[in-house]
């Protein structure tokens, strides 16, 4: 995928870039693999805002992605299409299995239409195949990594991300995460060979506020621009500092404060903390 630039015939076009979508092979999603995605506006089931600055945006269909792939062990699948997914930064691949079933997976970098992929302990460690970590060679790059066997992929799912296998010890495999963290993951956890595709996504420049609104993002209001009743940083004549350590609207310290719980159960799996 390449990044497309524009002539500056308006101020917003000067900086704006888009994906050229050249790698896509299908426009409409597979109807049986989609479902409605109602908008929340950042509200919970009581109608209260639990996530600020969310609302509006283009209507979307949710594409049902197979993050497990365990139940298709030993069944060959052919890549029928590479598609756009509005719900994530990565592209998705439509698989046609030999038993007649169709499923979506995250499209790794380099996967093409017509390629054959497989899953399971007997699968070869080649691009697009999903297999337990104990069968992945040291040094290999993987994505869609499980943290709990059978739970489904949780790590390295965004565009361009990957995890590298660093070593193996008894029932665990040491992997390097995109954050730089070295972590032990159970060897029965599944991962897919290769890095997630659409790596150029990080170079996209929105260029104007309207494109953020199309994505369902509302303007992020600064606390210092509010009144004292609305935020601890608010008030004052003209532009004034917060006058205290940066805090959230609810008075909790923020901007650099570590929020990870002390003595968390998963601490024993972390070999080296993220940088």
Swiss-Prot record:
PROSITE patterns, per database record: RIBOSOMAL_L2
Sample GO molecular function, one term: structural constituent of ribosome
GO cellular component: large ribosomal subunit
Domain of life: Bacteria
A family per Pfam: Ribosomal_L2
Compositional bias per record (Basic residues), positions renumbered to this chain: 255-275
Region named Disordered: 1-20, 214-275
This protein's UniProt keywords: Ribonucleoprotein, Ribosomal protein, RNA-binding, rRNA-binding
Stretches that traverse the bilayer: none
Family per record: Belongs to the universal ribosomal protein uL2 family.
HAMAP family: Ribosomal_uL2_B
Function: One of the primary rRNA binding proteins. Required for association of the 30S and 50S subunits to form the 70S ribosome, for tRNA binding and peptide bond formation. It has been suggested to have peptidyltransferase activity; this is somewhat controversial. Makes several contacts with the 16S rRNA in the 70S ribosome.
NCBIfam families per record: rplB_bact
Quaternary context: Part of the 50S ribosomal subunit. Forms a bridge to the 30S subunit in the 70S ribosome.
Name used for this protein in its record: Large ribosomal subunit protein uL2
Lineage summary: Bacteria, Thermotogati, Deinococcota, Deinococci, Deinococcales
């Amino acid at each position: 995928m390449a990044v497309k630039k524009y002539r500056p015939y308006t101020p917003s076009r000067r900086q704006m870039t888009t994906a050229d979508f050249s790698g896509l092979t299908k426009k409409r999603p597979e109807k049986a693999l989609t479902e409605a995605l109602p908008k929340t506006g950042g509200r919970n089931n009581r109608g209260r805002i639990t996530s600020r600055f969310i609302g509006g945006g283009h209507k979307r269909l949710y594409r049902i992605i197979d993050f497990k792939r365990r139940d298709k062990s030993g069944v060959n699948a052919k890549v029928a299409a590479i598609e756009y997914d509005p719900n994530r930064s990565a592209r998705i691949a439509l698989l046609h299995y030999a038993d007649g079933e169709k499923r979506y997976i995250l499209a790794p970098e380099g996967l093409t239409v017509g390629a054959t992929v497989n899953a399971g302990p007997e699968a070869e460690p080649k691009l697009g195949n999903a297999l337990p970590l104990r069968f992945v060679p040291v040094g290999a790059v993987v994505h869609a990594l499980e943290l709990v066997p059978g739970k489904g992929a949780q790590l390295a799912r965004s565009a361009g991300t990957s995890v590298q296998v660093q070593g193996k010890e008894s029932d665990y495999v040491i992997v390097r995460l995109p954050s730089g963290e070295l972590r032990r993951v159970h060897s029965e956890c599944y991962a897919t060979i290769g890095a997630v595709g659409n790596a150029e996504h990080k170079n996209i420049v929105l260029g104007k506020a309207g494109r953020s609104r199309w994505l369902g993002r509302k303007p992020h209001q600064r606390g210092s621009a509010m009144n004292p009743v609305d935020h601890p940083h608010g008030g004052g004549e003209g532009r004034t500092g917060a006058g205290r350590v940066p805090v959230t609207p609810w008075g909790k310290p923020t901007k650099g404060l570590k929020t990870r719980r002390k003595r968390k159960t998963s601490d024993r799996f972390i070999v080296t903390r993220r940088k």
